[in-house]
């Protein structure tokens, strides 16, 4: 079912160098999608992206989602039909230390990705991947 849907579809994955993004681009590639990544360079050693040698399998643009010009160029050149948006500043502790960076990346950066998708005209589906941290923690009594 998935294979027939994704086969030959142009799919762009933001956050492709992250843990989830790395696995997603490989899975989409295995399903026959024409996949492109857009992400910062991996910031851990080793990284899943490097360990799986994804740069040899999936063309990836190394850039920041705050860079509107590079985002628009990437969208306009590749013309994705489907976008999986995983790029974010996900670290809670860093968000306390760097709240402006976190807000810019997670809010303005996401807006930039959405706007690039809207303007390029080829996107038919946009999947915004988020985190459990966006929900209020409710303590449940265990019994």
Model regions and ranges:
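N-terminal Rossmann-like NAD(P)+-binding domain of SDR-like oxidoreductases, especially those catalyzing
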Residues: 1-143
């Amino acid at each position: 079912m998935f294979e027939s849907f994704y086969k030959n579809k142009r799919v762009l994955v933001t956050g492709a160098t992250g843990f989830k993004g790395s696995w997603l681009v490989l899975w989409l590639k295995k399903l026959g999608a024409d996949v492109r990544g857009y992400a910062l360079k991996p910031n851990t050693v080793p990284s899943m992206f490097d360990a799986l040698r994804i740069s040899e399998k999936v063309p990836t643009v190394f850039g920041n989602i705050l860079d509107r010009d590079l985002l628009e160029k990437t969208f306009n050149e590749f013309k994705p039909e489907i976008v999986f948006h995983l790029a974010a500043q996900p670290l809670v502790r860093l968000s306390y230390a760097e709240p402006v960076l976190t807000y810019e990346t997670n809010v303005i950066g996401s807006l930039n990705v959405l706007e690039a998708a809207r303007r390029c005209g080829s996107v038919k589906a946009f999947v915004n991947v988020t985190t459990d941290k966006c929900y209020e923690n409710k303590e449940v009594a265990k019994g």
